[in-house]
Amino acid sequence: MALILGIESSCDETAAAVVEDGRRVVSNVVASQIAKHSPYGGVIPELAAREHLTAIGPVVDQALKDAGITPADLSAVAVTHAPGLVPALLIGMTYAKGFAIANDLPLIGINHFLGHIYGAFVGEDAPYKFDDPALYPMLAAVVSGGHTSLVVLTPDGKSHLVGTTLDDAAGEAFDKAAKLLDLGYPGGPIIERLAKNGKTDAHHFPRSLTGAAGKPVAPENRFNFSFSGLKTSLLYLVRDLGGADKLSEEQLYDCLASYQEAIVDVLCTKIFDAAKQYRVKSVVLCGGVACNGALRERFEQRVPKNLIALTAPKKYCTDNAAMIGGLASFYHRSGAYNGLDLDAQARLPLSTELPFSLR
């Protein structure tokens, strides 16, 4: 039995979790900073780092307490080292390194992006294991505030980026729309809640890079995303309706429902076009935006019968440390540890090797 402490601090959640053998989540603690960043309509990196510094110790202590263990019971400590906000990452990494030294534990650096994919496999009730050959090749759709990317994972342990956003990520599109309409932060959950009262076909928003407007899509952009035009279209619509402060409730709800519909439509169209093109056996939907009920419902509706579809549980879609500690079990098994020179990186190539090979 291997108990791994996972630590996550890549953005605005300070999280720690204890995971047993990559599957059983023994404890999972998350300290959110939403209230701190909400007045600014987005995450302020320096503020995030200060909040992490205050929260990291108590959060780790609580994770150990909830698990009913001491550091002596752990097999390793894992920490997100990239990608993310460097000031925020450094807090989690510095703490993890100190914890590893003090308790004579190996250190494992985790790619936050791969961690999100593993969110669909952590938990004893997860229907598949990450290294199940029946799933490969796999298409992972990582949809969050920082990413909107399609990655093909192959049986030889490689991952290949086949699509990404050219401008705003889907989560940013939600946040910026909420800011435009003075709805609050984070925008995704607020828009989802209000959009339930509106008509999805009340307004037509552009579906960029899909060919929906009769414009041919360049081959290199077939699986890429662009949401900046969608945001601009909303800006013009609101202006034409008299401004955000002049919208009736019905107008607001219709705008949001139609806007959300455009995002969901583009995401699902690209996901399943890529799944067909690359002849994958499974598709994984993960990342913070995967909490969106409309997206989850449409994703499940459009899954072809020949595909295995996995959607990460909502509690493992947003940033958490269970996905970090769970994924780390594969590195622990192979002894793939990191030294204390492990560095924080704002960006990391999304085409990277997995911690296992099925060949």
Spans of model-derived segments:
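N-terminal beta-alpha supersecondary unit
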Residues: 2-73, 79-83
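Conserved phosphate-binding/catalytic loops in two-lobed NTP-binding clefts
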Residues: 109-110, 299-324, 338
